[in-house]
Amino acid sequence: KIRIITKLDNPDWIILAVKSYDVANLIELLRNCSAPILCCQNGIKTYLQLTEKIGKDRIAYMVTGIGSSKIGTGKAEFRGSGFTFIGEASGVASPRLIDLSELIRKSGITCEVVDDVLSYVWLKTIINSSINPVAAHAKVVNGELRKPELNKIVHKICMESTMISTEIGINLPLEPWLEI
Protein backbone atom coordinates (compact mmCIF):
# COMPACT_ATOMS: atom_id res chain seq x y z
CA LYS A 1 0.00 0.00 0.00
CA ILE A 2 1.17 3.50 -0.80
CA ARG A 3 0.38 6.26 1.65
CA ILE A 4 -0.65 9.44 -0.17
CA ILE A 5 0.44 12.64 1.53
CA THR A 6 -0.69 16.18 0.84
CA LYS A 7 1.30 17.93 3.58
CA LEU A 8 4.99 17.62 4.39
CA ASP A 9 5.83 17.75 8.11
CA ASN A 10 9.42 19.00 8.34
CA PRO A 11 11.32 16.14 6.71
CA ASP A 12 15.15 16.19 6.67
CA TRP A 13 15.05 15.77 2.89
CA ILE A 14 12.41 15.42 0.22
CA ILE A 15 13.49 12.82 -2.31
CA LEU A 16 11.72 13.60 -5.55
CA ALA A 17 11.57 10.44 -7.66
CA VAL A 18 8.66 10.93 -10.03
CA LYS A 19 8.32 11.20 -13.78
CA SER A 20 9.36 14.61 -15.08
CA TYR A 21 5.83 15.42 -16.27
CA ASP A 22 4.59 15.10 -12.66
CA VAL A 23 7.01 17.67 -11.24
CA ALA A 24 4.91 20.69 -12.30
CA ASN A 25 2.00 19.35 -10.22
CA LEU A 26 4.22 19.17 -7.12
CA ILE A 27 5.81 22.63 -7.27
CA GLU A 28 3.34 24.28 -4.86
CA LEU A 29 3.58 21.46 -2.32
CA LEU A 30 7.37 21.60 -2.51
CA ARG A 31 7.45 25.39 -2.29
CA ASN A 32 5.41 25.33 0.93
CA CYS A 33 7.96 23.16 2.73
CA SER A 34 11.38 24.36 3.85
CA ALA A 35 13.20 21.02 3.52
CA PRO A 36 15.92 20.56 0.91
CA ILE A 37 14.92 18.56 -2.17
CA LEU A 38 16.99 15.81 -3.78
CA CYS A 39 15.71 15.42 -7.31
CA CYS A 40 16.32 12.04 -8.92
CA GLN A 41 15.55 13.03 -12.49
CA ASN A 42 17.17 12.78 -15.87
CA GLY A 43 16.79 15.93 -17.81
CA ILE A 44 17.46 19.60 -17.92
CA LYS A 45 13.84 20.80 -18.00
CA THR A 46 13.10 19.57 -14.47
CA TYR A 47 16.33 21.09 -13.17
CA LEU A 48 15.32 24.45 -14.62
CA GLN A 49 11.72 24.18 -13.32
CA LEU A 50 12.83 23.46 -9.77
CA THR A 51 15.64 26.00 -9.58
CA GLU A 52 13.51 28.77 -11.11
CA LYS A 53 10.35 28.13 -9.06
CA ILE A 54 11.86 26.99 -5.74
CA GLY A 55 15.41 28.34 -5.80
CA LYS A 56 18.89 26.89 -6.09
CA ASP A 57 19.45 26.99 -2.33
CA ARG A 58 16.99 24.11 -1.70
CA ILE A 59 17.62 21.95 -4.76
CA ALA A 60 20.12 19.10 -5.01
CA TYR A 61 20.28 16.68 -7.89
CA MET A 62 21.19 13.02 -8.20
CA VAL A 63 22.47 11.73 -11.52
CA THR A 64 22.96 7.98 -11.73
CA GLY A 65 23.95 5.33 -14.19
CA ILE A 66 22.39 2.46 -12.27
CA GLY A 67 20.68 0.31 -14.87
CA SER A 68 17.47 -1.66 -14.80
CA SER A 69 15.06 -3.12 -17.29
CA LYS A 70 11.32 -3.49 -17.15
CA ILE A 71 10.51 -7.20 -17.06
CA GLY A 72 6.78 -6.94 -16.50
CA THR A 73 4.05 -4.71 -15.14
CA GLY A 74 5.43 -3.10 -12.01
CA LYS A 75 8.59 -5.23 -12.16
CA ALA A 76 12.15 -4.27 -12.99
CA GLU A 77 15.41 -6.15 -12.98
CA PHE A 78 18.75 -4.71 -11.86
CA ARG A 79 21.16 -4.55 -14.82
CA GLY A 80 24.27 -3.07 -13.24
CA SER A 81 25.62 -0.16 -11.32
CA GLY A 82 27.40 2.78 -12.82
CA PHE A 83 28.11 6.25 -11.57
CA THR A 84 26.05 8.18 -9.02
CA PHE A 85 26.75 11.86 -8.51
CA ILE A 86 24.94 14.32 -6.27
CA GLY A 87 25.37 18.04 -6.02
CA GLU A 88 23.55 21.16 -4.98
CA ALA A 89 22.22 23.52 -7.62
CA SER A 90 23.91 26.36 -5.73
CA GLY A 91 27.28 24.79 -6.53
CA VAL A 92 28.27 24.49 -2.86
CA ALA A 93 28.14 21.15 -1.06
CA SER A 94 26.49 21.78 2.30
CA PRO A 95 27.05 19.60 5.38
CA ARG A 96 23.51 18.24 4.90
CA LEU A 97 24.43 17.03 1.39
CA ILE A 98 27.65 15.44 2.64
CA ASP A 99 25.61 13.62 5.31
CA LEU A 100 23.12 12.44 2.67
CA SER A 101 25.94 11.17 0.45
CA GLU A 102 27.29 9.14 3.39
CA LEU A 103 23.85 7.62 3.93
CA ILE A 104 23.65 6.70 0.24
CA ARG A 105 27.11 5.08 0.43
CA LYS A 106 26.10 3.11 3.53
CA SER A 107 23.20 1.67 1.51
CA GLY A 108 25.74 0.18 -0.91
CA ILE A 109 25.59 2.76 -3.69
CA THR A 110 28.80 4.45 -4.74
CA CYS A 111 28.10 8.17 -4.56
CA GLU A 112 30.30 11.16 -5.29
CA VAL A 113 29.49 14.75 -4.32
CA VAL A 114 30.16 17.21 -7.16
CA ASP A 115 30.17 21.00 -7.43
CA ASP A 116 28.70 21.53 -10.90
CA VAL A 117 25.78 19.11 -10.87
CA LEU A 118 24.20 20.71 -13.95
CA SER A 119 27.12 19.48 -16.06
CA TYR A 120 26.33 15.95 -14.83
CA VAL A 121 22.66 16.43 -15.71
CA TRP A 122 23.84 17.35 -19.21
CA LEU A 123 26.09 14.28 -19.32
CA LYS A 124 23.20 11.99 -18.42
CA THR A 125 20.91 13.75 -20.91
CA ILE A 126 23.42 13.20 -23.71
CA ILE A 127 23.81 9.54 -22.77
CA ASN A 128 20.04 8.96 -22.63
CA SER A 129 19.32 10.88 -25.82
CA SER A 130 21.95 8.82 -27.64
CA ILE A 131 20.80 5.41 -26.43
CA ASN A 132 17.05 5.55 -25.84
CA PRO A 133 15.68 6.56 -29.25
CA VAL A 134 17.90 4.10 -31.11
CA ALA A 135 16.96 1.22 -28.80
CA ALA A 136 13.26 2.13 -29.04
CA HIS A 137 13.30 2.49 -32.82
CA ALA A 138 15.23 -0.76 -33.32
CA LYS A 139 13.08 -2.48 -30.65
CA VAL A 140 16.16 -3.83 -28.85
CA VAL A 141 17.51 -3.77 -25.31
CA ASN A 142 20.44 -1.45 -24.68
CA GLY A 143 23.02 -4.25 -24.80
CA GLU A 144 22.14 -4.90 -28.44
CA LEU A 145 23.28 -1.39 -29.34
CA ARG A 146 26.79 -2.86 -29.51
CA LYS A 147 25.90 -4.22 -32.95
CA PRO A 148 27.98 -2.19 -35.43
CA GLU A 149 25.04 -0.82 -37.43
CA LEU A 150 23.29 0.46 -34.27
CA ASN A 151 26.47 1.50 -32.49
CA LYS A 152 27.34 3.79 -35.39
CA ILE A 153 24.02 5.65 -35.01
CA VAL A 154 24.38 5.94 -31.23
CA HIS A 155 27.90 7.31 -31.72
CA LYS A 156 26.75 9.95 -34.22
CA ILE A 157 23.96 11.15 -31.91
CA CYS A 158 26.33 11.25 -28.95
CA MET A 159 28.95 13.25 -30.85
CA GLU A 160 26.33 15.72 -32.11
CA SER A 161 24.88 16.25 -28.63
CA THR A 162 28.35 16.63 -27.12
CA MET A 163 29.19 19.25 -29.73
CA ILE A 164 26.00 21.18 -28.92
CA SER A 165 26.76 21.16 -25.19
CA THR A 166 30.27 22.47 -25.89
CA GLU A 167 28.90 25.19 -28.20
CA ILE A 168 26.62 26.53 -25.46
CA GLY A 169 29.37 26.51 -22.84
CA ILE A 170 28.67 23.33 -20.88
CA ASN A 171 31.90 21.85 -19.50
CA LEU A 172 31.09 18.14 -19.40
CA PRO A 173 32.77 16.33 -16.50
CA LEU A 174 33.25 13.06 -18.42
CA GLU A 175 33.37 12.06 -22.06
CA PRO A 176 29.80 10.90 -22.87
CA TRP A 177 30.84 8.37 -25.50
CA LEU A 178 33.18 6.64 -23.03
CA GLU A 179 30.33 6.42 -20.52
CA ILE A 180 28.05 4.75 -23.09
Task: Label the model's feature ranges.
Residues 66, 119, 180:
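Positions that flank functional sites
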Residues 1-75:
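Rossmann-like NAD(P)(H) cofactor-binding subdomain of soluble oxidoreductases
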Residues 33, 53-58, 74-174:
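Internal alpha-helical scaffold of NAD(P)-dependent oxidoreductase catalytic cores
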